[in-house]
Amino acid sequence: MSFNHKTIEELHDLLVAKEISATELTQKTLEDIKSREEAVGSFITVSEEAALKQAAAIDAKGIDADNLMSGIPLAVKDNISTKGILTTAASKMLHNYEPIFDATSVANAYAKDMIVIGKTNMDEFAMGGSTETSYFKKTKNAWDHTKVPGGSSGGSATAVASGQVRLSLGSDTGGSIRQPAAFNGVVGLKPTYGTVSRYGLIAFGSSLDQIGPFAPTVKENAQLLNVIASSDVKDATSAPVRIADYTSKIGRDIKGMKIALPKEYLGEGIDPEIKETVLAAAKQFEALGATVEEVSLPHSKYGVAVYYIIASSEASSNLQRFDGIRYGFRADDAKNLDEIYVNTRSQGFGDEVKRRIMLGTFSLSSGYYDAYFKKAGQVRTLIIQDFDKVFADYDLILGPTTPTVAFGLDTLNHDPVAMYLADLLTIPVNLAGLPGISIPAGFVDGLPVGLQLIGPKYAEETIYQAAAAFEAVTDYHKQQPIIFGGDK
């Protein structure tokens, strides 16, 4: 018997009643992972021995009835540090790296007696939108194995969507949680910048990165955010604000809520059927008592260009530490120090990572800094101001998560610009440091469509409230791919 159809609350009740043990739940989860892994390829590492050892220890002391997450398995994206478990960032550069410390988000999960079941596949160093740049494998979409799962947190999304695990962690720099959540029909939240500590996250774009949760439902997503969100003195960008319970508004009605629908989010490049899906969702919110009105975010069209200058510049700086000297891969054909640097980085990084390092180095160079990096920072401010103006009058922003549904494997990985444009609708949220969620909102050609809800900073509770209200009157989250046991 598989437990992957049970909610976290249902699993908790079974554990407290001793109808199952943490060890049995872990064993069943490992079986679910193994039976589906060949089809989807969600994991780089499955930490079977460590997980069973941890489960046995939890059983020995007993399940805490007041701790919802006690004994619950968790999959973790492979750019989040896990002590004693390989953390590769899906790169040859770190293919054998085993950290000696846990990321704060992982430590918080351990503190709640969650069981880290394994590390999920991703785009190398989180640079990509399809999980095709991984050094190890290409993950496949849970709904159609000829399609991409999205990225960069593709493995974390497919692990939940395919029923391998109930909960997982990802990271979002320009849409890397929300886009794969949309492509796989699950709930993925990018929290407000600073809500979840970045300590132990292998950095890509330090002013953009944020760890966040994946789950099958809105409430379970909020329950996982309750675990990982915390202020942290180890992270200089950690926010002091701490909401006690992100589920507190779930179940409340949304009568009187004002929701903005930016005309730019339904314009050029958006699949007409996705536009129809979003407009239908807007009518559903109106039926629930909310007001939905068209607004403008005029500078959002510059988001992709701004993002790839800023993110690549930050990446070129962050990735300087991978030099073949201290840890990770070192080229064995080097004869001197210069060759160690050059050969290690040439051989250790994949093409997309090298492309972004070069772009970032160029943008930061003395002759071009003002024209590119400085200018990008100025336009970023304009994008932030656009959001501020809208949120002065509205509670949330509504729109599609992605311009299209999941595209085919090996169709965009040789066209960087087309791949970058797939993040058109998610990038502005990271540039502004805002919270954003993707929830299932329909299907086009049998593939899931994600609906994005964006809020002002620290408005996760309101986002969850609206998302849960929509979820309660639709059944998209209940529909599952064949690999999970569904009929699609």
From Swiss-Prot:
InterPro entries in the record: Amidase (IPR000120), Amidase_CS (IPR020556), Amidase_dom (IPR023631), AS_sf (IPR036928), GatA (IPR004412)
Top-level EC class? ligase
Q: Give the UniProt entry's GO cellular component terms.
A: glutamyl-tRNA(Gln) amidotransferase complex
Assigned EC number: 6.3.5.7
Which Gene Ontology MF annotations are present? ATP binding; glutaminyl-tRNA synthase (glutamine-hydrolyzing) activity
Biological role stated in the UniProt entry? Allows the formation of correctly charged Gln-tRNA(Gln) through the transamidation of misacylated Glu-tRNA(Gln) in organisms which lack glutaminyl-tRNA synthetase. The reaction takes place in the presence of glutamine and ATP through an activated gamma-phospho-Glu-tRNA(Gln).
Tell me how this protein assembles.
Heterotrimer of A, B and C subunits.
Q: What is this protein called?
A: Glutamyl-tRNA(Gln) amidotransferase subunit A
